[in-house]
């Protein structure tokens, strides 16, 4: 039974929020890091790539931490920061884009889960888009829906357990590769300049490797999205930094330790999940089984985490009238019931489409991954704007000048991420974001009787996005740009 009542707050502590952050970032891709990083880069270039990405993402993470401390009144921060800083339409667009991004992302987890199952039950789930894969994936969509409906606290607890079981095989991998590590192998062709396997300039190596590192941190905003349910505002910032630090350390070790046992050329040839191939080379079949099992647990855990986050955004947006009011409906367990059902329903439809067009699906997944980046940019810009205004609290635990520095660097790195996403994907993002305009207008008509949501500034923002979307449609239809 659905109940319209205020959400219970203060149910998630630092541990649960950290679990959400880690599971949001650590998906199935982490089990393929050794090969993905070594595919076109040397150990030296990989070290530089993680250093640059780590510094950049640190300022994104610190932006979220600072805002959670300075403006604890803004719940579901990644959406409310945008609304507070740049108006209702920008807030809606960020929420809309983030929601679409995670709907498609969750179906991506379903496809990856089925593909991982194929290792144990070939060939029934091969590629993740066979009929058995679609059926089982559909069942799991509604299983996760049921878990979250039983309460956010319970779902978050299960998520923490999943994170623990995900980290165990990764830590075993790190331990084994450390034991087999030989510095003489690691330093061989450290910069990838050997004539027989020349990888190009350090710059070109960095570019290819950075594209992998960029996506490794998507999900760092997990604690911020759940800030409305945090037991203490400070827990949000702590969880974000803890999750970021832990994941960065794991990413670096997973990427570099295999270079102490295998050459770059050997690592680049290992099939995904490459952690399984590395352990099979080092310790035999049991290592391969262990890592494939870990992959399955990791993907299921991330899927649960993103189910929680995906339903939370439209729920939070509906509470202040940005999304239709029905999305704010809760059940007796204080879960966003209506939002969950609509989200799961859209995931189900998308899952069925995967059966008919797997190639189109992979393209859509790349596009929607870019859709989360405007949220990082607007959050960083809001911190800069807040720090320069008189509204910045004088007694804030973080000084304004430090906040300005953090916000500026977070903004610059966000712009780099958007640039790295590619122009063709950005144009498609504009089209998908523009599809939300009718829903924004409808929601505004229902909640804003004075029609302030259609003032000149908001209309200009909508018009600009609509024109960019129309330009994108023209360029795609004229084959001027391609996905």
From Swiss-Prot:
Keywords assigned: Amino-acid transport, Antiport, Cell inner membrane, Cell membrane, Membrane, Transmembrane, Transmembrane helix, Transport, Virulence
Entries under InterPro entries matching the protein: AA/rel_permease1 (IPR002293), Amino_acid_antiprt (IPR004754), APC_superfamily (IPR050367)
Topological relation to the membrane, as annotated: Multi-pass membrane protein
Gene Ontology MF, one: antiporter activity
GO biological process terms on file: amino acid transport
A Pfam match: AA_permease_2
Residue ranges crossing the lipid bilayer per the database entry: 9-31, 46-68, 88-110, 130-152, 159-181, 209-228, 241-263, 295-317, 338-357, 367-389, 415-435, 462-479
NCBIfam families (alphabetical): 2A0302
Family to which this protein belongs: Belongs to the amino acid-polyamine-organocation (APC) superfamily. Basic amino acid/polyamine antiporter (APA) (TC 2.A.3.2) family.
Descriptive protein name: Arginine/agmatine antiporter
The encoding gene: aaxC
